[in-house]
Amino acid sequence: MAEALGAQELYEKMFEQRFTANDKEYQEYLKREQDQPPIVEDWKMGNQRNTDRYRDNRHHRGWDGRQNWSSNSYNQSYGRGGWGNSYNQYRQDRHNYQQGHYTHNPSNQRFHSDRY
């Protein structure tokens, strides 16, 4: 403990004039011209359209402006997904995938892969 106090006192003595008017190196640093910030050109990958993930892309929704494809009356009345609806198929495939490759461990509530 005494060595730690001695080291602390040593460093305080070494750096007591740091960043003051008596610190010649720091004063030279303050006198130098500031660096210009870097200029980054084409940071949005040039002229590629529809790459903004925050854009909602309304022009891809369909000819009649339906916003929720999985709950329209066409798909519900015929009971077979209809045109343009693969949501239930995706969920079924995903469910089978999770059952095939992952097991649930109730002791720590995490999924463990049997692939490794």
Curated annotation (Swiss-Prot):
Its main location: nucleus. It comes from the Eukaryota. InterPro entries: RAMAC (IPR028271). Residues 31-116 are annotated as: Disordered. Keywords: mRNA capping, mRNA processing, Nucleus, RNA-binding. One of its GO terms (biological process) is RNA 5'-cap (guanine-N7)-methylation. It holds the Pfam family RAM. One of its GO terms (molecular function) is enzyme activator activity. A motif (RNMT-activating domain) lies at residues 36-42. Residues 67-78 have a biased composition (Low complexity). Residues 97-110 have a biased composition (Polar residues). Residues 56-116 are annotated as: RNA-binding. It is found in: Nucleus. GO terms for cellular component: mRNA cap methyltransferase RNMT:RAMAC complex; mRNA capping enzyme complex; nucleus. Disulfide bonds: none annotated. Residues 1-55 are annotated as: Interaction with RNMT. Regulatory subunit of the mRNA-capping methyltransferase RNMT:RAMAC complex that methylates the N7 position of the added guanosine to the 5'-cap structure of mRNAs. Promotes the recruitment of the methyl donor, S-adenosyl-L-methionine, to RNMT. Regulates RNMT expression by a post-transcriptional stabilizing mechanism. Binds RNA. Belongs to the RAM family. This is RNA guanine-N7 methyltransferase activating subunit.
